[in-house]
C-alpha cells in the first residue's frame, strides 16, 4: 500500500475544535423563519415502489352540473356576414374601372417565357441513348424543361384527338360503306409492310376460318414448368406429351386437383400402329395412361369476368392459313404434397373409344352453325315482313271488295223486292177499287203472300247467279293467297341463301364449297372421338 503524506495545513485543521461543526444552510425564504431546523438525512437509499392509486384522480377535470346546464350565447351578425339585397340589383354589380390590388394584378398576368440563352439549357433536352436518366435521384432533368402548352389549354384535347382519329359511323350508309370497304381491302394485294417500307412479303396466303376443326372446342393449357418426365428427353418426351391427357380428380379430403397422365409404353405402340394404318383408333383396344403430376388449376372462359378473345393460327402448306378460337384458358401450377395425405401417384387412366352420341353431335352442329350463319340478317327479315304484310293487305282488300260487291247485290235485291211489293199492293188496291170478284182478289193476295215468303223465280235466279259469282271470287282470293304465300316462301328462301352467301368469308364459291365439304368430312371423322373421359 502506498504511504499517505499529511501536510502541515491538514494537521492544523485536524486539531481545531470547530473542525467537525457544520454551518447551518442558508434558507431560501425571504422572511425570517422562526424554526429553522433542517431536514434530516434520508435514512436509506431511494427505491422504486409501484404507486397503487390512479394518477389522474388529482388532475382529471370533471365539469359540474352547473357548467353543463349553462347555455352560452352565440353572438353573431344577423346576416351571418352575407349581405343580400333583393331590392337593389346594383348592389352586386362590379365596377370595371376599379383599380386592382398589385398582388391581384400579378395573379392575373399571363406567364411570359423568358428567352433562355444559356448553353446548359439548350443542351438540356438532348436525349443520349446510351445514358440512363436519373429522374428518381434528382430533378435536374426537369429543372430546365420548357412546357409550351399550359394545362388549362390541354383539357379535352385527348378526347378530341381520339374522336378525330377514329371514324365514327353515325348513319346506316356510312356503316354499309365501311363494311363493303373491308371486303375490298381484303382483295388488295400486299406489296410492303404497313410501317416498314423496306420490308416486302415473301409469301402471301389467305386467312380463313378453320371449317375442319371449328366444331371441336379448343383450350389453351399453360404449365408453370416443363411437364415432361425427367427420365426422358428429346423426341420421346415430345411424343409422350403430344398424347398426354389431363383429368380432374378429388383426393380423400375432398380437395379437387388436375392430374396429368402420360401414355404407357404399350399405349405408345398402339398409337404408333394406328398412325401407320391411318386410323384414329381401334374399336376394341384399351389405352392405358399413368399419372405423372398433380396440379392446381385456374380457369378462364367466356363466362368469366375480364375474358379476352384469343385465337390461334394453323399454317397448311399449299392451302392457306386458318384460324380457330380458344374458348378456355387453363393455368396449371404444381400441387404441393401434404404431410400425412396419400398421393394418387399410382392412379391409372383406362381409355376406350366410342362413337359420339346425339348430344355431342348437336353441340358440334351448333358450333358449325356459327360460321355458316343460317339465320337471315335483321334487314332481310324486315324486308320479308314488309313483303308479307303487303301481300296480306292486297288479299284483305280483295276480300273487302268481294264482300262490298256482295252487299251491293243484296241491297239491289232487297230494293227490287220492295218495289214489287208496292206494285202488287197498288194493283190489289186498283182491283178492289174497280170492283173485281172476290176470287181474283183472294188469288192475288195468296200470290203476294207467296212472293213475300218464298220469293219470285227471278229473285231465285239472281240469288243463284250472285252466289256463283261470290264463290268464284272466294276461289280466286284463295288462289291469290296461295300464290302470295308461295311467293313469300320463295323470297324467304332466296333471302336465306343470300344471307348465307354474304355471311361467309370473302373467298370464291368453289373454295367455300370445298371448305364445307371438308368440314363435313371432319365431322364424319371426328364422330369417332374418344369417350367423355378421354376428350
Curated annotation (Swiss-Prot):
Residues 361-374, 389-434, 442-453 have a biased composition (Basic and acidic residues). Residues 1-23, 361-535 are annotated as: Disordered. It is found in: Nucleus. It comes from the Eukaryota. GO terms for biological process: cellular response to lipopolysaccharide; endodermal cell fate commitment; mRNA 3'-end processing; negative regulation of myeloid cell differentiation; negative regulation of transcription by RNA polymerase II; positive regulation of cell cycle G1/S phase transition; positive regulation of transcription by RNA polymerase II; protein localization to nucleus. Its main location: nucleus. Residues 352-400 form a coiled coil. GO terms for cellular component: Cdc73/Paf1 complex; cytoplasm; fibrillar center; membrane. The modification Phosphoserine is found at residues 117, 456. Residues 502-511 have a biased composition (Low complexity). Keywords: Coiled coil, Isopeptide bond, Nucleus, Phosphoprotein, Transcription, Transcription regulation, Ubl conjugation, Wnt signaling pathway. GO terms for molecular function: chromatin binding; RNA polymerase II complex binding. The keyword Transcription regulation applies. The keyword Phosphoprotein applies. Residues 375-388, 458-470 have a biased composition (Acidic residues). There is a cross-link at residues 133, 154 (Glycyl lysine isopeptide (Lys-Gly) (interchain with G-Cter in SUMO2)). Component of the PAF1 complex (PAF1C) which has multiple functions during transcription by RNA polymerase II and is implicated in regulation of development and maintenance of embryonic stem cell pluripotency. PAF1C associates with RNA polymerase II through interaction with POLR2A CTD non-phosphorylated and 'Ser-2'- and 'Ser-5'-phosphorylated forms and is involved in transcriptional elongation, acting both independently and synergistically with TCEA1 and in cooperation with the DSIF complex and HTATSF1. PAF1C is required for transcription of Hox and Wnt target genes. PANTHER family: RNA POLYMERASE II-ASSOCIATED FACTOR 1 HOMOLOG. Belongs to the PAF1 family. Component of the PAF1 complex, which consists of CDC73, PAF1, LEO1, CTR9, RTF1 and SKIC8. The PAF1 complex interacts with PHF5A. Interacts with POLR2A, TCEA1, SKIC3, KMT2A/MLL1, SUPT5H, RNF20 and RNF40. Interacts with UBE2E1. This is RNA polymerase II-associated factor 1 homolog. It comes from Rattus norvegicus.
Amino acid at each position: 500500500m502506498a504511504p499517505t503524506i499529511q501536510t502541515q495545513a491538514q494537521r492544523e485543521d485536524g486539531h481545531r475544535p470547530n473542525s467537525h461543526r457544520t454551518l447551518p444552510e442558508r434558507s431560501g425564504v425571504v422572511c425570517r423563519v422562526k424554526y429553522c431546523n433542517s431536514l434530516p438525512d434520508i435514512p436509506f437509499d431511494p427505491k422504486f415502489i409501484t404507486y397503487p392509486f390512479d394518477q389522474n384522480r388529482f388532475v382529471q377535470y370533471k365539469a359540474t352540473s352547473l357548467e353543463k346546464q349553462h347555455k352560452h350565447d352565440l353572438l353573431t351578425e344577423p346576416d351571418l356576414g352575407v349581405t343580400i339585397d333583393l331590392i337593389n340589383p346594383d348592389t352586386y354589380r362590379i365596377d370595371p374601372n376599379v383599380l386592382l390590388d398589385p398582388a391581384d394584378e400579378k395573379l392575373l398576368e399571363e406567364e411570359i417565357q423568358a428567352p433562355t440563352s444559356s448553353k446548359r439549357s439548350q443542351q438540356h433536352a438532348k436525349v443520349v441513348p446510351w445514358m440512363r436518366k436519373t429522374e428518381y435521384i434528382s430533378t435536374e432533368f426537369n429543372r430546365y424543361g420548357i412546357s409550351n402548352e399550359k394545362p388549362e389549354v390541354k383539357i379535352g384535347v385527348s378526347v378530341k384527338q381520339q374522336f378525330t382519329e377514329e371514324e365514327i359511323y353515325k348513319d346506316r350508309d356510312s356503316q354499309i360503306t365501311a363494311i363493303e370497304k373491308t371486303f375490298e381491302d381484303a382483295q388488295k394485294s400486299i406489296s410492303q409492310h404497313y410501317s416498314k417500307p423496306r420490308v416486302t412479303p415473301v409469301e402471301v396466303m389467305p386467312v380463313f376460318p378453320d371449317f375442319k376443326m371449328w366444331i371441336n372446342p379448343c383450350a389453351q393449357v399453360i404449365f408453370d414448368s416443363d411437364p415432361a418426365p425427367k427420365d426422358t428427353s428429346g423426341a420421346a418426351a415430345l411424343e409422350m406429351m403430344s398424347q398426354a391427357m389431363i383429368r380432374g380428380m378429388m383426393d380423400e379430403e375432398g380437395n379437387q386437383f388436375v392430374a396429368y397422365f402420360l401414355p404407357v409404353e404399350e399405349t405408345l405402340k398402339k398409337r404408333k400402329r394406328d398412325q401407320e394404318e391411318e386410323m384414329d383408333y381401334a374399336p376394341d383396344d384399351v389405352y392405358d395412361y399413368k399419372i405423372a403430376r398433380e396440379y392446381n388449376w385456374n380457369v378462364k372462359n367466356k363466362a368469366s369476368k375480364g375474358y379476352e378473345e384469343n385465337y390461334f393460327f394453323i399454317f397448311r402448306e399449299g392451302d392457306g392459313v386458318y384460324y380457330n378460337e380458344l374458348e378456355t384458358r387453363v393455368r396449371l401450377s404444381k400441387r404441393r404434397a401434404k404431410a400425412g395425405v396419400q398421393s394418387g401417384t399410382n392412379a391409372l387412366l383406362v381409355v376406350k373409344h366410342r362413337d359420339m352420341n346425339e348430344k355431342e353431335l348437336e353441340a358440334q352442329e351448333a358450333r358449325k352453325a356459327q360460321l355458316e350463319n343460317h339465320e337471315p340478317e335483321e334487314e332481310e327479315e324486315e324486308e320479308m315482313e314488309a313483303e308479307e304484310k303487303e301481300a296480306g293487305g292486297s288479299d284483305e282488300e280483295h276480300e273487302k271488295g268481294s264482300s262490298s260487291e256482295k252487299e251491293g247485290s243484296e241491297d239491289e235485291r232487297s230494293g227490287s223486292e220492295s218495289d214489287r211489293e208496292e206494285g202488287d199492293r197498288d194493283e190489289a188496291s186498283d182491283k178492289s177499287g174497280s170492283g173485281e170478284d172476290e176470287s181474283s182478289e183472294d188469288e192475288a193476295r195468296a200470290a203476294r203472300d207467296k212472293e213475300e215468303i218464298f220469293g219470285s223465280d227471278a229473285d231465285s235466279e239472281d240469288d243463284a247467279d250472285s252466289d256463283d259469282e261470290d264463290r268464284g271470287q272466294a276461289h280466286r282470293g284463295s288462289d291469290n293467297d296461295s300464290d302470295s304465300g308461295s311467293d313469300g316462301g320463295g323470297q324467304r328462301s332466296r333471302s336465306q341463301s343470300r344471307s348465307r352467301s354474304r355471311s361467309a368469308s370473302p373467298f370464291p364459291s368453289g373454295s367455300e364449297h370445298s371448305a364445307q365439304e371438308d368440314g363435313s368430312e371432319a365431322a364424319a371423322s371426328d364422330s369417332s372421338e374418344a369417350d367423355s373421359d378421354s376428350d
